[in-house]
């Protein structure tokens, strides 16, 4: 039954509504002070019934606009507030909400359903629709798979995109790994009846409200205020709060601001740091610099305490999808279980902070496009002062700073290449680099390969994606960039918001497959451990402001991400605030390949014997060849790094498929009973 498959969501109970053609189930997890008054599904006097999973951040504003009596304001849960907003403003209510939410409202008089998902997709919502017959929705796919009228056929295009590592910056589509099950897209609402199905993008960014910001200092102060408010909204709970503290700029910013907010309330912030027990990937000194300032209850999680295959399989079951974590699932499993053990009901992250507050690389890209080579050289010189600290390949790391600068300038300032870049002839760019032998060097040399081209991600999609189709088995070979649907996705998100053209590349990075996919993963894994995962950088107010941050401010004379660095002055330790390097986790990935028991070869062969379709999806010869190369000392590290990710994607797929086949989902109602659901 659906309610059984989703029972992990009902930490504080559940309730049902069943009347006429409609049925709803609500699972309770108390977070905010007023959530203890939730009684869902909730029916209004006007015959509208709501179920919601929501944290509404602009409650004070809505309570005033809806003229809620003063004596009842403290007792109105978010679901009741959303229902009142819908009855007041109709479908426009979704864009009046700030926060993380999904909700569905059934109109008993018109036999019509209205569903909406928050602006960035922090909370997931899935549905199955058989027009004129049935519309079913759930917070997790497994809830829909528990219904026997929902087909369970897998989507091979989705599998091919996963295996080939198609760019996460492609446009987000509503398809899941199951052909018949769709996801409500972020910033969209659905209207459904027996005769109608429609979906609409609703986000009005209203960027003109920032027109009063003129100077860098104006933007820094506005960013600081908005960021602190974003964190504060996510700490509104009577339960313990946790934060992921890697020691990076983003997680440290969130942790330090949350610490200050909670200290003022006499509370401590639980922090969790993933100790990968590998010197090359050690961020502990940065985390310890934050912890030294006090106000934290810290927990170290050791990655080696968790089995690789077991945790990968657990993540597949929780998410109804192959894992997509960049760092291996044991690293994530550790702090998820730790948060659960401490009784925390909110986990704060710095997720995608470097996408929302970007690197300001337009400062390099614009003069490249315009052929302003003197300006480019000047700005590149600033960039290179810090680029020498990046985690490049071992070969390039051994070079002197001057040689690194000369190397990049030599490539980018070559006349033929300059003309091709200026004219956006990307195929020619690749050809030039290939002929000169610099293609691998440039695009394998750590951060730089992406960041110079970052603002042109749509045009450079084929280069940035770096998909590799040789890993695809015979049944998936058709799903390359020449496939119409793959090609469509690679164009990036449509400009539904109507924003100016020069802001579109940044908008497309935010409104992308990767952004929403990882929100889904965090939400599901958190739900299975009894807490909500909250991402302050994904607050709609912060995103709207960040689209307008001056490029020169973010570039910050080559230090990059200047807005967040300047806004965090006096809030976090200087050693972390000015940190120029992100850790490279590829040594951890290599170690996992070398030490996994059983070996990747044995694991694959055993799974393929049990599930022959894996040989149709995965090119076995290529898979085994890549393992041999990655374990060998005869190949350069940068070459092996290009291959190893597809091996992990293959293992993730194996565990997803095995979970799907070996854990049949419970069925709830017979097919014949649902044929006249409307």
PLM feature segments, named:
Residues 1-321, 675-678:
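Cysteine-centered catalytic environments shared across enzyme families
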Residues 13, 19-20, 68, 92, ...:
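Adenosyl-5′-phosphate
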Residues 74-78, 97, 155-156, 216-224, ...:
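Hydrophobic (often cysteine-bearing) scaffold residues that line and stabilize catalytic clefts
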Residues 277-339, 357-373, 548-555:
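ATP-dependent adenylate-handling ligase core
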Residues 344-360:
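Short acidic/histidine-rich active-site segments
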């Amino acid at each position: 039954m659906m309610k059984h498959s989703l029972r992990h969501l009902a930490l504080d109970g559940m309730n049902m509504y069943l009347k006429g053609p409609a049925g709803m189930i609500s699972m309770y997890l108390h977070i905010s002070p007023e959530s203890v008054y939730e009684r869902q599904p909730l029916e209004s006097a006007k015959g509208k019934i709501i179920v919601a999973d929501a944290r509404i951040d602009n409650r004070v504003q809505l309570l005033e606009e809806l003229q809620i009596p003063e004596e009842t304001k403290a007792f109105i849960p978010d679901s009741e507030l959303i229902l009142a907003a819908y009855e007041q403003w109709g479908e426009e209510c979704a864009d009046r909400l700030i926060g993380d939410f999904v909700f569905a409202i059934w109109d008993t008089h018109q036999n019509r359903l209205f569903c909406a998902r928050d602006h960035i997709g922090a909370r997931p919502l899935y549905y199955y629709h058989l027009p004129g017959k049935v519309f079913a929705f759930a917070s997790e796919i497994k809830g829909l798979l528990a219904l026997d009228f929902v087909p369970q056929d897998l989507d091979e295009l989705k599998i091919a995109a996963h295996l080939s590592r198609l760019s996460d910056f492609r446009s987000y589509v509503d398809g899941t790994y199951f052909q018949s099950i769709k996801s409500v897209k972020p910033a969209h609402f659905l209207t459904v009846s027996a005769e109608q199905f429609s979906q609409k993008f609703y986000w009005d960014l209203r960027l003109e409200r920032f027109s009063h910001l003129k100077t860098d200092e104006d933007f820094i102060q506005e960013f600081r205020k908005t960021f602190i408010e974003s964190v504060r909204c996510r700490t509104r709970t009577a339960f313990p709060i946790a934060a992921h503290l890697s020691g990076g700029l983003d997680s440290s910013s969130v942790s330090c601001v949350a610490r200050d907010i909670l200290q003022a309330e006499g509370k401590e912030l639980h922090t969790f740091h993933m100790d990968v027990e590998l010197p090359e990937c050690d961020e502990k000194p940065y985390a310890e610099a934050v912890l030294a300032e006090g106000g934290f209850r810290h927990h170290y999680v050791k990655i080696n305490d968790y089995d690789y295959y077991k945790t990968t399989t657990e993540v597949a079951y929780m998410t109804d999808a192959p894992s997509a974590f960049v760092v291996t699932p044991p690293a994530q499993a550790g702090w998820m279980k730790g948060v659960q053990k401490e009784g925390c009901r909110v986990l704060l992250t710095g997720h995608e902070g470097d996408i929302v507050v970007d690197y300001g690389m337009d400062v390099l890209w614009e003069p490249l496009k315009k052929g302003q080579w003197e300006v480019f050289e000047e700005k590149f010189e600033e960039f290179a002062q810090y680029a020498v600290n990046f985690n490049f390949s071992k070969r390039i790391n051994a070079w002197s700073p001057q040689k690194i600068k000369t190397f990049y300038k030599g490539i980018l300032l070559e006349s033929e290449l300059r003309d091709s870049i200026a004219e956006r002839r990307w195929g020619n760019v690749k050809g030039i680099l290939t002929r000169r032998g610099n293609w691998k060097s440039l695009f394998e040399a750590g951060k730089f390969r992406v960041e110079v081209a970052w603002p042109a991600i749509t045009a450079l999609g084929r280069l940035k994606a770096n998909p590799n189709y040789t890993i695809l088995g015979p049944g998936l070979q058709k799903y390359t960039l020449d496939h119409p649907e793959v090609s469509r996705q690679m164009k990036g998100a449509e400009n539904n918001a109507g924003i100016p053209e020069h802001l579109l590349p940044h908008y497309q990075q935010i409104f992308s497959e990767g952004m929403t996919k990882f929100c889904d993963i965090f939400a599901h894994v958190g739900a299975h451990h009894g807490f909500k995962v909250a991402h302050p950088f994904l607050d709609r107010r912060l995103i709207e402001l960040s689209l307008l941050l001056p490029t020169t401010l973010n570039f910050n004379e080559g230090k990059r991400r200047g807005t967040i660095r300047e806004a965090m002055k006096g809030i976090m330790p200087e050693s972390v605030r000015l940190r120029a390097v992100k850790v490279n986790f590829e040594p951890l990935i290599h170690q996992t390949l070398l030490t996994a028991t059983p070996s990747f070869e044995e694991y694959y062969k055993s799974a393929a014997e049990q599930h022959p379709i894996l040989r149709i999806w995965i090119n076995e010869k290529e898979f085994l060849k890549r393992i041999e190369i990655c374990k060998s000392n005869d190949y350069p590290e940068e070459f092996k790094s290009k291959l190893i990710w597809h091996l992990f994607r293959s293992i993730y797929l194996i565990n997803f498929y095995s979970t799907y086949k070996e854990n049949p989902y419970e069925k709830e109602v017979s097919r014949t009973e649902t044929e006249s659901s409307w």
